[in-house]
Amino acid sequence: MSDPKCRILCVDDHFDTSEMLQVLLSESDYAVQTAGTMEEACALAAKSTFDLYVLDKRLPDGTGMELCERLTFLTPGIPCIFYTGDAYEVHRRQAFAAGATAYVAKPDIETLIETVHRLLAERECAAEV
């Protein structure tokens, strides 16, 4: 297996979800880091470069909407995917208003992985050899 090319930050306060995302996305040759809080995610984003964010809507120290707004301000142009159990249309609209690129309802992991592949295929990291 080659070195991972694209870097993903997954933010979810449920350890099992974070672990599952790390395993499944790593199998697709992505470098994956996880965070369980907004504070942890912002600290990682400030010191590392990511090509994509996967965010949960509910976090212990704020909302995914707040985090998405912060991340899009700190790192403009980096896509944010919401992967959340809150599948209501109002939440989807709020996520897009906060800067989300995509919104996938849990537990639809296949759609999430397809969305990650599609968004990262458009990024420079996917073209690196």
Labelled PLM ranges:
Residues 1-7, 110-129:
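Non-catalytic signal-transmission and effector/linker regions of two-component phosphorelay proteins
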Residues 34, 59-62, 97:
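Residue-level signal for the "D+5" position in two-component response regulator receiver
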Residues 37, 63-66:
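Acidic catalytic/metal-coordinating carboxylates
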Residues 48-54, 59:
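Active-site beta3 strand of CheY-like receiver
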Residues 65-76:
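Short amphipathic alpha-helix used as the core "switch/output" element in two-component signaling
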Residues 66, 87-105, 110-114:
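Alpha4 helix (beta4-alpha4-beta5 surface) of REC/receiver domains from two-component response regulators
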